[in-house]
A protein has these predicted regions:
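Long, contiguous binding/interaction regions
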Residues: 2-22, 32-64, 68-162
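Amphipathic, charged alpha-helical scaffolds that flank and support histidine-based chemistry
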Residues: 25-29
Length: 162
C-alpha cells in the first residue's frame, strides 16, 4: 500500500463463517485500476484464499465509536444530552469525572457526532473501530471457492485411484 501511495483508512480482521478462515477488511480510497492491481497482488500472497474489492454500494458497513466526555459538562449543558439522543448514541458508563458514550453506525454519523460533541467542549478522548463490512450479495464467495477446490481435489483422487 505504501509503495502505491494508498492510505489505509481502516483495517479490520475477524473470523469468517468458515472455521479457520479469517477475513481482512481493508478500507482505502483510490481509483479502480489501482485497487484491481492491489487486489491481484494480495491474491498472490501465501495463505490468501481470495481477495476481492467492493464499492460502498456493494457492502453493508458499520463502525463503533467510544467518546469519553467530561461528566460535569454533560450534567451542566443539556445540549450535550440532546446531541447524544439526536444520534441514537448511548451512555454506557458514568462516574464523577467522565462518562463514556457508545455509537454504532455509519462513518459519517460517527464523525458528525464527534464534531458536535467537540464543539460543545466536552470530549476527553475518542476512538473508533474502522469499518466492519459484509457484502450485500446472497452468497459467500469463499464458500464457493472452497467447494470448487474440494470437488477438484476429489476428482484428482478418483483419477489417481483408477
Amino acid at each position: 500500500f505504501t509503495r502505491r501511495q494508498i492510505n489505509i483508512e481502516s483495517l479490520n480482521v475477524s473470523a469468517s463463517s468458515i472455521k479457520g478462515v479469517h477475513k481482512y477488511t481493508i478500507t482505502a480510497w483510490t481509483d479502480k485500476d489501482t485497487i484491481e492491481k492491489v487486489t491481484k497482488q494480495i491474491t498472490k500472497k501465501i495463505d490468501v484464499l481470495q481477495a476481492h474489492y467492493f464499492t460502498d454500494d456493494e457492502i453493508y458497513q458499520h463502525e463503533i465509536a467510544l467518546y469519553k466526555l467530561t461528566t460535569p459538562t454533560l450534567e451542566e449543558k443539556p445540549e450535550v444530552s440532546k446531541v447524544i439522543r439526536k444520534y441514537n448514541a448511548r451512555i454506557v458508563e458514568v462516574n464523577s469525572v467522565f462518562s463514556i458514550v457508545e455509537k454504532n453506525g455509519m462513518s459519517e454519523e460517527i464523525t458528525n457526532l464527534y464534531e458536535e460533541l467537540s464543539a460543545l467542549g466536552c470530549v476527553l478522548q475518542f476512538v473508533r473501530s474502522g469499518r466492519v463490512a459484509i457484502t450485500t450479495s446472497c452468497f459467500e464467495r469463499v464458500n464457493e471457492y472452497l467447494a470448487d477446490r474440494e470437488t477438484k481435489y476429489r476428482q484428482s483422487k478418483e483419477q489417481q485411484g483408477q
